[in-house]
Amino acid sequence: MKTGLYRFTLVLLILIEAFPLYAFIDGQQKEEKSYKIAVCDWMILKRQKIGAFQLAHELNADGLEMDMGSLGKRDSFDNKLRQPHFQQLFKETAQKFNIEISSIAMSGFYGQSFLERANYKALVQDCLNTLVVMNTKVAFLPLGGVKSGWEQDSELRSQLVKRLKEVGDMAASEGRVIGIETQLDARGEVKLLEEINSPGIKIYFKFQNALENGRDLYKELRILGKDRICQIHCTDTDGTTLSYNKRIDMKKVKRTLDRMGWSGWLVIERSRDKDDVRNVKKNYGTNVEYLKTVFQ
């Protein structure tokens, strides 16, 4: 009887001693899971290059937003990840450096019009296939190349809504999401999403757009709400790195996102020192470190 009581007491004491450590580890994991920090491969000058993973690791990023490759006047993206050799190489290298893929970007549509591409479905399907290869869920589709004024032009707008509905449903059928970037304000984006009416289309929110248009960044986030935002480009235009940026109160951003209940990837696109723009390690290393201080 005494031996049994002694053993029970000993086990209890061990558990009591160990509990704070378990609680700390568990809490740390949850905190890290709430917000992860990624960099864009094309902005660190490693568009679809194998060296992007090592560089992202050296920058202390959690992940990488990979690009589909340049588009220009080509019929298709210059995408290495259609080839089995590169698929295996990229996956193995990402694992080696412990870098997750936050998303796959179709950045070619910054310059090319999504409305003027007859093969838009094939281009998006190529991206969806790449999401499967790299085991991630979010595709990034900027609408910067669409002719300005589409927002008020009923014919252009209806064509765009139709196309986005089609590709959104393609994505949803595969359990994926396409995050679109527009120049609309938050209320305008809510209305656009309602018109598209597809679970496969959400907003890829970009701080720079809100700030450049003189909008209240924190209010815009609240209007969109957590369920309409799939991912965030959490940077401003080039000028200063984030810790010196006077237009963004990053702690207020975190409080806003916390209250919204949003969690996910914060992706660093710009916010480079204008006097040293091509110094990748300085600009992106500084921004990663700052964001981790605030969000993790």
Task: Kindly give the residue locations of the regions a language model identified.
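Glycine-rich, proline-tolerant flexible connector loops at the mouths of alpha/beta enzymes
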Residues: 67-91, 143-151
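Active-site-proximal loop/turn and secondary-structure-junction residues that shape catalytic pockets
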Residues: 43, 68-70, 107-110, 143-147, ...
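Active-site acidic/histidine proton-transfer and metal-coordination neighborhood
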Residues: 57, 93-97, 110-203, 211-212
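Histidine-acidic metal/acid-base catalytic patches
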Residues: 23-38, 45-62, 173, 186-296
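Charged helix-capping and loop-helix junction motifs
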Residues: 80-87, 117-125, 153-164, 216-222, ...
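Bacterial N-terminal signal peptides that target proteins for export
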Residues: 1-9
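Conserved beta-strand positions in the central sheet of alpha/beta enzyme cores
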Residues: 65, 103-105, 140, 179, ...
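Bacterial N-terminal signal peptides
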Residues: 9-20
